[in-house]
Each structure stands twice: as C-alpha cells, then as structure tokens.
Amino acid sequence: MNKINRVAIIGGTHGNEFTGAFLVKKFQQFPEVIQKPSFETLTILGNPKAFEAGKRYIEKDLNRCFLTESLQNPNLSSYEDIRAKQIAGVLGEENQPKVDVVIDLHSTTANMGLSIILGNQDPFLLKLCAYLSEINPLVKVCYTIPEKGSNFLRSLNKLGFVIEVGAVAQGVLNAELFQKTEQLIYTILDYVEKYNQGNIPKINNLLSLYKFTGTIDYPRNGNGDIQAMIHPDIQFRDYAPLNPGDPLFLTLDGKAIAYEGTSIVYPIFINEAAYYEKGIAMLFTEKQLINFD
C-alpha cells in the first residue's frame, strides 16, 4: 500500500456526543499534538450547529447523509445534507479520496468501552486493529457488512472507521473516557507514522472480530408503544455472550422475555438512547477469530 499522506479526524458528527467534539476542539487549539513528520492530520467538527444546540442533529442524522446519490442530489437541502456535501468536499469520496484515512469519533450511552467499528476488512485496518487490541485488551473491534453504497460518514474512504466510546450520557463530558479516547488516537497516529517508515510493529496475526448480524426492537403494542425494557441481567453487558433462553427484556409489569434465537450472540449498543427513535434495542453480533498474514 502507498504511503499515508493525510489523516482526517472528525468529531461531533452527532452534536451531543461531546467526547469527539471536544477532542477536535482540543486538537484545533493544540495542533502540534496530532502532527507527525511523515503525514498531515486535519480535524473537522462534524455538525457545528447541532453541537451548539446540544442536540444529536438539527433536521436529520448527519451520519446517514453520505450516500453517493444523496451527495450528488442538488434537491436535498436540509442543514445536514448541505453539511454532508461540505464534509465530502474536504474528504473526497471513496473513488476520489482527498485524504488517506478517516477517523470518525463517536460516543454512546451503551457500555461499549473503547470500540473500533469497521465497514470493510482492508488489510491495513485489520493490522491496525490487531495492534490496538494487542497493546490494549480493552479495545474491541466490530465489523459491519461491506459498505458499498453506505450512508455513513466513514464510508467516504476505504480506510474510514469509527471510534465509539461509552458509556457516557448525551451532552456530557467524561474525563476518563476523554483521556482514553485521546490516547487511542495518539496510538493510531503513532502506528501510521511507523507504517510510513516501514517499521510496523510485529503483532499476533489473530484478531477477535464482532461481526454485525442484525438488530432487535423493543417489544411494542399495536400502537407502537414500548412494552418492555432491557432486562437488568444484560444492561451494561455489551459484548457479553447471550445464550438462547437468557432473559432479554423485562415487561412493564415485571415479566421476563427470553432471547429466542438459536445460537449465541454478543449484543452491542445495548439500550443506546439515540436508537429509540430508530426502533433498535440493541445490535447482535457473532464473535469471530480471523487469521491474516
């Protein structure tokens, strides 16, 4: 692979996710902390208006506005659609990138710890993630289906990925998570510098990967009203195995609803506040161990 010349760090794609937004503000105030000899690092505050308002978005979810057809559609004129086009103008798109790596910073009310979310299995990303998880076992790596035609910001670039940290409330800064995320970013930038110098650290060629398999909504009645909540046994237990028959939800009158799947899954984004409007109680993943050279 060619040398990496430009890395982009985006925070505040969702305006009420303060960890990434304030890290970008710090990096803009102290740019020397993210600069390396062999490549340039640029920063973008994703959704400035939503950040000022302390809201996830103004009119629509910015992180669902990056479909190629949407970016090329002059009739889409919401604030987030316009902002997506501005960001794509800086970063380029996958077939015409203007940067080499895109790091999109997010936070979650779910207990995701330090998570990396990939949209493809590019060898560079797999080796980076193997390195990160080897030096810090708390780092978990998730993989969604290949995102050709995706509407996520990270899909603008083949080497785009998300850092997702939690649990932290919306519109709140948590110093511990802020510092852990900051250190993770510095480690990534150090890795890129070593990569450019042809001095990639030796790592175990095994990586635990949590592959997205589906979602589940809260139980609802005929009017669409939620009738059950996350069962206490799995609340804040993201990445823990969920076996068939294990309690999944608790109805408003105190009855347990079991997981009816036929195989073990590993739930993530459990009880994410922003997903209530999307009809998602949690995401299901399967745990894989991949071997690469």
From Swiss-Prot:
User: Binding positions for substrate?
Assistant: 56, 63-64, 164, 275
Q: Which GO terms describe its cellular component?
A: cytosol
Say if the entry is tagged with keyword rRNA processing: no
What's a Pfam family in this record? AstE_AspA_cat
The UniProt entry, under InterPro entries, shows: AspA/AstE_fam, Aspartoacylase, AstE_AspA_cat, Aste_AspA_hybrid_dom
Q: How is the cofactor bound?
A: Binds 1 zinc ion per subunit.
Mention one GO molecular function: zinc ion binding
Annotated EC = 3.5.1.15
> CDD domains, alphabetically?
M14_ASPA
Q: Which Gene3D superfamilies match?
A: 2.20.25.160, Zn peptidases
Query: What reaction does this enzyme carry out catalytically?
Result: an N-acyl-L-aspartate + H2O = a carboxylate + L-aspartate
Q: Where does Zn(2+) bind?
A: 14, 17, 106
Q: Which UniProt keywords apply?
A: Hydrolase, Metal-binding, Zinc
Q: Which cofactor does it need?
A: Zn(2+)
Q: Is Zinc tagged as a keyword?
A: yes
Superkingdom of the source?
Bacteria
Q: Which family does it belong to?
A: Belongs to the AspA/AstE family. Aspartoacylase subfamily.
> HAMAP family attached here?
Aspartoacylase
What's this protein's name?
Answer: Probable aspartoacylase
Per the UniProt record, the source organism is Trichormus variabilis (strain ATCC 29413 / PCC 7937) (Anabaena variabilis)
